[in-house]
Amino acid sequence: MCGRYQRRSDKQRIAETFAVAAGLDETSFDPGDDFSPQSMQPVIHLNENGERQIEMMRWAFKLSDRPRPLFNARSEGIEHAKFWRDAFLKGRCIVPGDAVFEWQETEKGKKKPKYEFVIPGQEPFGMAAVWKLWKNPKTEHWERTFAVLTGEPNELMAPIHDRMTTFVEPRDYEEYLAPTERPPVHLLRVLPAEKMRARLVDVSPISNKQVSLFDSQ
């Protein structure tokens, strides 16, 4: 299934916002208005030296016993979930973005209003995510793959959808990325509605390309 988010911030702004120390020279990417699953995206994690590094990863978390990739992981109970607990303990990462999109559910056959959600003052913001290495059986190459965490919606999102991206607040970046013996589930908070803004950006015909960011849990 598909999801959508926007990243207008360039590499330099992302590096400054997230205090990235490594990977800048080796990583190249362009801003864009509409990114979807299966695409390669810049992701921030700690490298073996404990530095914040930016690397390109595929938005398609791969599990050995599932043929289809997963794009999202539920925040609730992730520290105990069979598919996610190891990645949340050892592979926490942050995905920079500037807006997320959601299509409001309507009666069958009617057009779906598309809404944009932003966090004023956080351009870019950080989406909580997890990553892992996956060996592509076709190429025999190892690929970095990731999934975005989601949780209960706040009052702004609830009328549009029953799931919402889990955001990492700036004061929590260091703790979220740092290696720990116990997973920092206390950081997976619902962002208060007053910190976000939403606006209607389009009313489009229903299409297979307009599937929620939050449906592939």
Predicted regions and their residues:
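Short linear sequence motif anchored by a di-proline
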Residues: 1-217
